[in-house]
Amino acid sequence: LEMRRVPITKRVLVVGAGPAGLSAAVYGASEGFSTLVVDEGGLGGQATSSSLIRNYLGFPRGISGRRLAQQAYEQAWVFGANFVFMQRVTDLRREHDGLFVTLSDFGRVGARAVLLATGASYRRVGVPALEALNGLGVFYGGAVSAAPAMAGHDVYVLGGANSAGQSALHLSRYA
């Protein structure tokens, strides 16, 4: 998609490129709707940090979050969806001629429908000493990417629910 400041118009604009946003892109584009997916980060959202997702439709044996995101992206792209990454949505307005989203560096995009699939953010521990080490030994949801670097180290997982257990199991293969 060419970067320009002139407003473009899409039938469907999806904010977020995690599993929910990618699913919306597949369905919208497969129905022939001009579809644009915008994400302030990259492809897959938090799902990319999961080594195994077992509760997603169509994958009874599970799939890695990264692979799920890549396959969904390819499927949406085949149907004609467009993608813009590293763009933050700074404004959403309803005007007399439709909905308009303003992107950080891209300008305005018009759409008949805007779907917000912004996902979630990791709950931080809130300990200043740990925050200073973020990415330098302290990771939030980084089990997949950080695991090989943990070889021979003691690893501690703080958190609950399914994703913490999956991270602990995945990290145990390396640490």
Residue spans for each PLM region:
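Residues at secondary-structure transition points
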Residues: 47, 51, 63-67, 128, ...
